Amino acid sequence: MAPTQDPNSVGGGAKKDEATLKVPSKDPKKKDEKKDEDLSEEDLELKQNLELYVERVQDPNPELQKAALESMRQEIRASTSSMTSVPKPLKFLRPHYGTLKAFHETMADSDLKKYLSDILSVLALTMSADGERESLRFRLIGTEGDIGSWGHEYVRNLAGEIAQEYTKRQSEEASIDDLMELVQQIVAFHMKHNAETEAVDLLMDVEDLDLLLEHVDKTNFKRTCNYLTSAARYLPGPDDMLVLDISYMIYMKFEEYPNALQIALFLDNTQYVKQVFTSCTDLLKKKQFCYMIARHGITFELDDEMVADDDDREALQDIVNNTKLSEGYLTLARDIEVMEAKTPEDIYKAHLLDGRASSGASVDSARQNLAATFVNAFVNAGFGQDKLMTVPSDSTTGSSGNWLFKNKEHGKTSAAASLGMIQLWDVDSGLSQLDKYFHSNDNPIIAGALLGVGIVNCGIKNDCDPALALLGDYIDKEDSSVRIGAIMGLGISYAGSQNDQIRNKLSPILNDAKAPLDVIAFASLSLGMIYVGSCNEEVAQSIIFALMDRSEAELGDALTRFLPLGLGLLYLGKQESVEATAEVSKTFNEKIRKYCDMTLLSCAYAGTGNVLKVQDLLAQCGEHLEKGDIHQGPAVLGLAMVAMSEELGVDMEIRSLERMLQYGEQNIRRAVPLALGLLCISNPKVTVMDTLSRLSHDTDSEVAMSAIISLGLIGAGTNNARIAGMLRNLSSYYYKDMSLLFCVRIAQGLVHMGKGLLTLSPFHSERFLLSPTALAGIVTLLHACLDMKPIILGKYHYVLYFLVLAMQPRMMLTVDENLKPLSVPVRVGQAVDVVGQAGRPKTITGFQTHSTPVLLAAGERAELATDKYIPLSPILEGFIILKENPDYREE
């Protein structure tokens, strides 16, 4: 066998490209002589040998043929193991490809013919014309040998040809068995050589992902599943669900339970969640699962199959019920030293502004006080103390009663409810503080207390159902504000619980001819939240009948929009399941028909990133309509809802919203800021911030109000200094306009929400999981903001409290095996996407080291900076249980 050529030697290097590009000359002899002069001796020898083999292959003597083929095969194999440039033997055999092919046709079937097929198959790698798939054709009639020995590039090329051939055979309905045998070989080869992504791509092309389960092993299953889960985002349904199913099975096979649980939650498959619990035997791990379920916000009952011991089961159910949330949040607050209560004035920072604005604001107007109530509630949310509502009543500076009465009628509702927000997640203390309002004779105060009870219980489940016990009796009272307080309270406290007792109480209201429209609207919303994403037929029927019973005048009312929204929430993220209901909605009155259609479509595909639905919604937004058509608002919001699931979609959506601002009609421009607010919620991107800042000075006050609220949403819970500065300047710019000033105040409250410890983002677990209840709360607020004047600036401002459904601490808190806080060093930095990269790349960049508990901003990831402990969850967010590492040695 000739020695292989050193790639740097002059002969090889100079001719590398030339040889492959030259057009055959008229006088082959002359050309050959010229070419031979340029080759080094080794190359020349190789070339002559190969030419000799080609002649010998055509020799009638089978012995000679066999020897020649064997030598040729050796030459090719020796050179194809590395594929940086076209290997020499392939280059020199180019002119003879046709000759060999023609001779191959004439050979009788024998082992020698198969041998030649193998060689032709490799030559076809560089020679065959596009779309001929010759490499594959020769491979299929060649020997059954190991394909890997011909090198990586060859296998890769084969995989590409198989995909094309498969599609062709599928359309002709021909047999694919021979292809599948080859696929088996290729997948095995790829999985052995760290090319999991290519193996997965091939299996997706031939629609046989189940093969993966046989080929994954301990070394590559994580990389394989990572690739599968990130690819699922870009696949059309139902393929995406299938891919996730496979990765769930792989995780279960290797007992990687936390990851399997995440996929089970993503698929919203209770059977899978149960399976994770029953398969895992480690109680500590089960506790970690419970924290994950609690963060996701679904109602989940453990049974004796999942946890055998009664005491253990009770302890675990407590974690699922989120009873530990308040305690963990306050631990974080103490650690960061932000327990000191803040007043609205601390947030407004009016002293930083020029004189004229701050002087005008000293007037004690009801609208200003209402704004201060909300700011106070958002900023001190969950801390259990503030300076307006929880002051002891005998203090000289003014008591909680005083602040309550600084608000006018319906303002008192929001003020009383704000006490629930301040006591957020601390059920016992919250209920005892709200108790005094139940004895009031003032209906708005009772309504606020009822709503407050709902807020305190938000996301916290309790066996004795205090919220239902307290609120159930008030649903059928005379006064509609009290009824709304009770209904909204139930909707917030039981969101996602699918509680039938409450359905039996609320459904009759929808079909009660005497009930006022606002009560019906809120009942529909609450039912939508309690049954969010459940596709419950009975609730859907009740809401549909309620919509059909509305008169022309009622359909024009701003609150009517909550009926289709309640209906949409039932199908949140459930894709095709909405189609039957969408058909029914086409029979509604034309005033509401399109609005309903857009709302259903956008809810059903929320967070799926479905490109076709984005196109449908864009088409709706492109129409230039008469005044009075309101369905484009939800279509614009729908764009954001569908596209928000992954970064690429978000960036594309931001660009198309920019276009809409330039070319869209007025009603579209009003919704665009809200859509931007949803896309970047609690994630203040500078470009979006600048767009909203520009829109906040728009001549159309509706656009300006939407933009201001959205500035609050994108900065929610971040304490972002730049947004805070913008809002301060806006407060002096709009100091004469009460409505706009109210919006500025609300936005200021949102930016400083929870003193910077909370987030409104419905995504968690590194943006993989979307919490349905959180999204429901945000979307409800955004739909209300499509028509600000009658709702948020009218007497239904307490709709703002729906945001509590999305409020979550943006913390990472490590606890020991007894669930007591444990401080360990962690690195926090920008998350890096490492899917499909070789080796073990760093997963975070630009990190700082802190000791836990720590705050995580949008797009940040944490990793432990010590080997002393092993975290029980691969994703460090929320509550993380640490187990001591038995192999750790102190240095």
From Swiss-Prot:
GO CC, sorted alphabetically, is: cytoplasm; cytosol; mitochondrion; nucleus; plasmodesma; proteasome complex
UniProt record, GO biological process? innate immune response; protein catabolic process; regulation of cell cycle; regulation of protein catabolic process; response to salicylic acid
Q: How does gene deletion manifest?
A: Embryo lethality due to development arrest at the globular stage with defects in the formation of the embryonic root, the protoderm, and procambium. Increased cell sizes, anthocyanin accumulation, reduced growth rate, reduced fertility, decreased heat shock tolerance, increased oxidative stress tolerance. Mutant displays enhanced susceptibility to the fungal pathogen G.cichoracearum and to virulent and avirulent bacterial Pto DC3000 strains, which indicated defects in basal defense and resistance (R) protein-mediated defense.
Q: Which Gene3D superfamilies match?
A: Leucine-rich Repeat Variant
PC repeat ranges are 414-447, 448-484, 485-519, 522-556, 565-594, 674-705, 724-739
Pfam families of this UniProt entry? PC_rep, RPN1_C, RPN1_RPN2_N
| InterPro entries in alphabetical order | 26S_Psome_Rpn1 (IPR016643), ARM-like (IPR011989), ARM-type_fold (IPR016024), Proteasome/cyclosome_rpt (IPR002015), RPN1_C (IPR041433), RPN1_N (IPR040892)
Tissue-level expression reads: Expressed in stems, leaves, buds, flowers, siliques and developing seeds.
Answer yes or no on keyword Ligase: no
> Mind telling me what this protein is named?
26S proteasome non-ATPase regulatory subunit 2 homolog A
What lineage is on file? Eukaryota, Viridiplantae, Streptophyta, Embryophyta, Tracheophyta
